[in-house]
């Protein structure tokens, strides 16, 4: 990604910094942008958000080696775009950053605007037969986290119950594997806004190089096709964008 051709910050060096307190530390081993911005000094990479928002494609696949800030960038993207379930977003997190001032502030209109589905499949790497469990646990966790958005009485009750069963761990494999498309549909209806999908380690199951044997006798690529990519296709205009982070192109090609 270009980071808007290395947008020039306020420093003479052209490098913008976030969190310049004298006692700030480097975010070594940290992946949560909000926590890091409050506790550490960060190089301002917020124009990555502009790169994603300005991309002509609605699906952005970012491939970077391990240790190159994939999880931090996704966390930053989520912190900027995610609409809170209750209350108002705190604008101070991005005040003074490059993205906040770029283009005369034109990106501020998308701040805290969208419901965000955030999936982390990175734990599936090397997990062998447990790949399916890692993927399905990630889906279940997001159903739990996003349930507060689905309290509107006019939502289709059968679909809300589908989400609730997955959140409680009472759903069968078919229901879990198909839940992402339902979740995106309901979030768009509940919030009257398109949905953002963020996936960390989308290629993890493929990278594991280990076939899995479940009730469907599927391999990891087929699992991702069914759980992730079929849902992206089904979502259509319900999604503002999808950003997938991984180490290799693999199944996203």
Name each model-derived stretch.
Residues 2-36:
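Charged, amphipathic alpha-helical linker segments immediately N-terminal to NTP-binding catalytic cores
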Residues 29, 34, 44, 50, ...:
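P-loop NTPase motor core
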Residues 58-76:
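Walker A/P-loop nucleotide-binding motif
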Residues 124, 191-217:
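Conserved P-loop NTPase "ATPase switch" module shared by AAA+ and STAND
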